[in-house]
From Swiss-Prot:
Full protein name: Endoregulin
Subunit structure: Homooligomer. Can also form heterooligomers with other sarcoplasmic/endoplasmic reticulum calcium ATPase (SERCA) regulators ARLN, PLN, SLN and STRIT1/DWORF. Monomer. Interacts as a monomer with ATP2A2/SERCA2; the interaction results in inhibition of ATP2A2 Ca(2+) affinity.
General function of this protein: Inhibits the activity of the calcium ATPases ATP2A2/SERCA2 and ATP2A3/SERCA3 by decreasing their apparent affinity for Ca(2+).
GO cellular component term of the entry, any: endoplasmic reticulum membrane
Membrane topology summary: Single-pass membrane protein
Domain of life: Eukaryota
Tissue: Largely expressed in non-muscle tissues with the exception of weak expression in body wall muscles at 14.5 dpc. Expressed in epithelial cells of the trachea, bronchus, lung, intestine, pancreas, and liver.
Main location: endoplasmic reticulum
């Protein structure tokens, strides 16, 4: 009979055990979220200024 192959983990355990990899991923995530937050503020305040000028 055939042998069952043990299921492989989706996440590599070696990656999560290395603090440099986790730290690098954290920094990349923070930069990305900060950039998206700046874009969101630019869009929101840009539209607010346009709406104020149109009312006057």
């Amino acid at each position: 009979m055939g042998q069952m192959v043990p299921p492989r983990s989706i996440q590599n355990e070696d990656f999560w055990k290395n603090p440099w990899d986790v730290g690098g991923l954290t920094v990349i995530g923070l930069f990305t979220s900060t950039f998206l937050l700046f874009v969101l503020f630019a869009v929101v305040f840009g539209y607010v200024e346009k709406a104020v000028f149109e009312e006057e």
